[in-house]
Amino acid sequence: MSAVTGTFRIVSEEEQALRTKLERLTTKDHGPVFGRCQQIPPHTLQKAKDELNETEEQREAAVKALRELVQERAGSEDVCKAVAEKMQGKDDSFFLRFIRARKFDVHRAYDLLKGYVNFRQQYPELFDNLTPEAVRSTIEAGYPGILASRDKYGRVVMLFNIENWDYEEITFDEILRAYCVILEKLLENEETQINGFCIIENFKGFTMQQASGIKPSELKKMVDMLQDSFPARFKAVHFIHQPWYFTTTYNVVKPFLKSKLLERVFVHGEELESFYQEIDADILPADFGGNLPKYDGKATAEQLFGPRIEAEDTAL
């Protein structure tokens, strides 16, 4: 008889209880969306351990290793030199975002740092004078929106309601600039780093004029933002109420999507039963088929930046 070998670890009752809790979470089990995380919930720490290979010892070792890798690679290629320059003065919490986004694989975290810097070099128009005040009016208009409550998985839910979007009044680039500011701001929160984001795109009222007005290059820029350019875990993208000609726009996007993100795209149309199984109607505004009042972008901007007169004015 051949010997059976392997490594076995006794799972504590506390750990098992946390894993059981993870299977039946509600929106009330998570911390606030806005502001820094005061304390990571125990079940979220367990999730980080199970999904991201995170432990207290690993955090310290991985940050140290990533810092060293940044310096080691600084003299190799231009983007590596740019990474080293961009990372000067960054604290451990900044590096930890990238490590968590790549499940504590330090080399993949470094590649993400390169993507983060390269995206800024590739699309400088998105980052020119990029301050909270520069994008505030776009966010107040709801492009994009952010729910005040996390979903049951602890993810931040971002909204886009295309019906009233005038792409001549608010350009595609202005919306992407708003996304960039929002992502930087929300990723200061450790719960968000671990649990990630969910995006809901409401295409009710999407016109053929809007469809023809969006350039393929703009769609690619959006996909580049979602893939390998931010230390963010994009866990799901839901499209609802899309008309038949939405397929044309989506077919332009699909070739740019990597298989991992493509698997996380859900196109619901008018059949929303599975959508509401994932996203509780009690956290959704009325204009997204939920039980809350209509979405208020001005309230969101205040949550992000404070009142207008006190808003930050620091370039990212």
Swiss-Prot record:
One of its GO terms (molecular function) is retinol binding. Residues 135-296 form the CRAL-TRIO domain. CDD domains: SEC14. Residues 45-72 form a coiled coil. The keyword Acyltransferase does not apply. Gene3D superfamilies: Alpha-tocopherol transfer, CRAL-TRIO lipid binding domain, N-terminal domain of phosphatidylinositol transfer protein sec14p. PANTHER family: ALPHA-TOCOPHEROL TRANSFER PROTEIN-RELATED (PTHR10174), RETINALDEHYDE-BINDING PROTEIN 1 (PTHR10174:SF200). Interacts with DEGS1; the interaction increases synthesis of chromophore-precursors by DEGS1. This is Retinaldehyde-binding protein 1.
